[in-house]
Amino acid sequence: MNIMNTEQSQNSIVSRIKVFEGQTNIETSGLPKKPEITPRSLPPKPTVSSGKPSVAPKPAANRASGEWDSGTENRLKVTSKEGLTPYPPLQEAGSIPVTKPELPKKPNPGLIRSVNPEIPGRGPLAESSDSGKKVPTPAPRPLLLKKSVSSENPTYPSAPLKPVTVPPRLAGASQAKAYKSLGEGPPANPPVPVLQSKPLVDIDLISFDDDVLPTPSGNLAEESVGSEMVLDPFQLPAKTEPIKERAVQPAPTRKPTVIRIPAKPGKCLHEDPQSPPPLPAEKPIGNTFSTVSGKLSNVERTRNLESNHPGQTGGFVRVPPRLPPRPVNGKTIPTQQPPTKVPPERPPPPKLSATRRSNKKLPFNRSSSDMDLQKKQSNLATGLSKAKSQVFKNQDPVLPPRPKPGHPLYSKYMLSVPHGIANEDIVSQNPGELSCKRGDVLVMLKQTENNYLECQKGEDTGRVHLSQMKIITPLDEHLRSRPNDPSHAQKPVDSGAPHAVVLHDFPAEQVDDLNLTSGEIVYLLEKIDTDWYRGNCRNQIGIFPANYVKVIIDIPEGGNGKRECVSSHCVKGSRCVARFEYIGEQKDELSFSEGEIIILKEYVNEEWARGEVRGRTGIFPLNFVEPVEDYPTSGANVLSTKVPLKTKKEDSGSNSQVNSLPAEWCEALHSFTAETSDDLSFKRGDRIQILERLDSDWCRGRLQDREGIFPAVFVRPCPAEAKSMLAIVPKGRKAKALYDFRGENEDELSFKAGDIITELESVDDDWMSGELMGKSGIFPKNYIQFLQIS
């Protein structure tokens, strides 16, 4: 009976198809089921966009299509027998979207869609919904359809639908974007089980990921159709209602993502018209990848693509930090940069010769101001230089008392200072008063009231009544003599020395650069080349560009700072080498640089001499130079003119000290305090000239200007070098300041930690006199350290 019913239905379908072909689209509207077709005609709009209008399919459309299929299934069979080739390709193209989007396009493709391999699962559904009589007929139909479809498959590859749908779009898309679209698909993709029901499709998807973008071929289409046809009979008896529910789900919404993926590989193109929903499913594909092909998942592939193509994905942000270390070796940071206020550019650094480099070395000993400025720029200076308040409060020794009347040096160092002597013991009863003992020397600072004076004793200051002290040097005489003090007079600039005015600020950027400020006066010491000078400013020496200054008096030609050769007349006289640079502050003073050779003309006094350098003559301090040639011993003794201000006794002592070349010298190992008037007191480290050996235990010697006897066990003989040095330098040893000392009176010598003090002379057990930068004065012994003469 089933066969008879099938033949009758086929004959009726054939007749209907013939009538249907002769009719126009208007006739199709005259069918009795027009009201059901009308809602289905709405989806044609999404079908125009080939694959993206998949949003149109809805469960209502499925029901309508099921009713329509019940009336058209017979027609589909007749068309397959008659061999209507144009319809089958349209069927396959619209089968996957559940026959909703593409059916409204044309009535013919809508009829043929029911022949798709998925229709066998829906045929029974439609018939069961229509009537129970037609339920047995769908089972044989899939078999006939398989044969008809397989016979028509040879013509199917020529169908232009497959290449038109997806490949041209996705060929231009990048691989990274395609994989990103996959990542978007899985969360919203409901029809995952449909893809699981077609394992062949999954395998094709896996293999397609590895392929490059080939165009779809007919064989691939045949394989896909054949595989679906084979699987259809198994699905007919299987789960019909679950498939219907899955079709009802909004699977077509993921159609755009499916279209992007198959375009890249070529094996999945046949799945575009048939299985768009399964393709977006990422989890089953990833599982299939890991189990079947054993290759990376899509997410990992996307990460690899982003890492391999950082320019496209923007993941190359981590690369810039690696770039900075590269140019460090190749790049050279500009050594010199023009200051902010400087219009001219800095010239290239000068090329200095070996001699110039040697001369540029910082001297071991410098002036106090030089040493102070250099120490401020170094960490050593920070530790050594301290404020006076810190010095007195923390670790500096206490100032010793001033020399009292009767002391051998009292008249020399205290008479010029306004001071008085306490007549009685004074105990301060009110704040601001000074306490002292009888006989203490009080230095008068100012007169506060009619009967009170502001005085100082050591570190303490306070008021003292006039009746409690005896004034030795009043304040009025001190004030009258003060204007004559050259230390308080304004010292003009040496207009005769080569100098220049700074036009622009020049910040020192190298060790040898001289930091200059606009408006300063810089003394020119050497013209290195046409672009650079070497000069002195604020007791600092360095090089600076010539275009930053305006030269007032230039260095004469031939005197480019290079040490002049000693002329013939130079050899005849005495010479000395400059130990430090010296800039003359008076017109009659001689300016010179460190290391220059000065021709001695005459000695002005004990501290000054007249000399000649670079054709210029002037006076200069002797403690800035070092003798080069031994002073002549025959004829007029040079040293005899060196100390014209000394007394006759001191004169003879100095001459004997120098002339007695075979004199023996010793160094004090321990301090010795005189117990009688004939004893010679000295400190540890002092160098004493032995005048006579009294016996094996006692000797007579001279220390500075004092003579006396001392025990031989307290000293040791000096080496030959020390003897020769002491013979040449009569002033003896040098001392290095350990702490800052600020003289509170004019007779005191102020210095800073690190200064080198010369012309040492012992005043008493606590005080010494010395010279620094042309100034002499007294200072406490415990503030200095004696230097060994080498």
Swiss-Prot record:
Disulfide linkage: none
Protein keywords: Cytoplasm, Nucleus, Phosphoprotein, Repeat, SH3 domain
Subcellular location: Cytoplasm; Nucleus
Gene Ontology cellular component annotations, sorted alphabetically: cytosol; nucleoplasm; plasma membrane
Residues annotated as domain SH3: 415-477, 495-554, 571-630, 661-720, 730-789
Compositionally biased spans, kind Pro residues: 336-351
Main location (coarse class): cytoplasm
Presence of the UniProt keyword Nucleus in the record: yes
SUPFAM superfamilies reported for this sequence: SH3-domain (SSF50044)
Domain of life: Eukaryota
Gene Ontology terms describing biological process: cytoskeleton organization; positive regulation of membrane protein ectodomain proteolysis; regulation of cell morphogenesis
UniProt modified residues of type Phosphoserine: S65, S369, S762
Pfam families given in the database record: SH3_1, SH3_2, SH3_9
Record GO terms (molecular function): proline-rich region binding
Chain segments carrying region Interaction with SH3GL1: 342-358
Tissue expression from the record: Widely expressed with highest levels in heart, skeletal muscle, kidney, liver, placenta, small intestine and lung. Expressed at low levels in colon, thymus, spleen and leukocytes.
Compositional bias (Polar residues): 287-296, 365-374
InterPro entries per the UniProt record, alphabetical: Endophilin_SH3RF, Eve1_SH3_1, Eve1_SH3_3, SH3-like_dom_sf, SH3_domain
Region of interest (Disordered), residue spans: 21-196, 241-374
Function: May play a role in regulating A disintegrin and metalloproteases (ADAMs) in the signaling of EGFR-ligand shedding. May be involved in suppression of Ras-induced cellular transformation and Ras-mediated activation of ELK1. Plays a role in the regulation of cell morphology and cytoskeletal organization.
Subunit structure: Interacts with ADAM12. Isoform 4 and isoform 5 (but not isoform 1 and isoform 2) interact with ADAM9, ADAM10, ADAM15 and ADAM17. Interacts with SH3GL1 SH3 domain. Interacts via SH3 3 and SH3 4 or SH3 4 and SH3 5 domains with SOS2. Probably forms a trimeric complex with SH3GL1 and SOS2. Interacts with SH3YL1.
UniProt-recorded name of the protein: SH3 domain-containing protein 19
Organism: Homo sapiens (Human)
